[in-house]
Amino acid sequence: MELSEIKKRLVRYGELKPCKTAFIDAHTPGSNQKENFTIIGSGVSESADQHVHINIPHGFNIGAAGQPPKCRNSLHSHRTAEVFFVLSGRWRFFWG
């Protein structure tokens, strides 16, 4: 693979562009500080403003989210797996 092709598939952490209107709940108090990142693939964003970092077809999506303390994520469901990795801070997960 040529270096130019590799660069098309490289996203540096410092270059991630967040979307603060990715989902309908981003407009509600308590959820309005979330940042959504679509890293590989189009993801599940509901916003035309969402920046897709790597839009080359892969057959999967990788995204990320950032939220300050006490910021809520509304209950929702997926037909695919959703996996959480905590990179920093303290998180509490609840569902049901």
PLM regions and their residue ranges:
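Conserved short histidine dyad/triad with adjacent acidic residue
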Residues: 43-49, 61-78
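Conserved hydrophobic/aromatic positions in well-ordered beta-strands
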Residues: 38, 63-65, 84
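A short beta-strand-loop-beta hairpin characteristic of the jelly-roll/cupin
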Residues: 77-96
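A short, N-terminal "cap"/entry segment at the start of jelly-roll beta-barrel domains
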Residues: 1-59
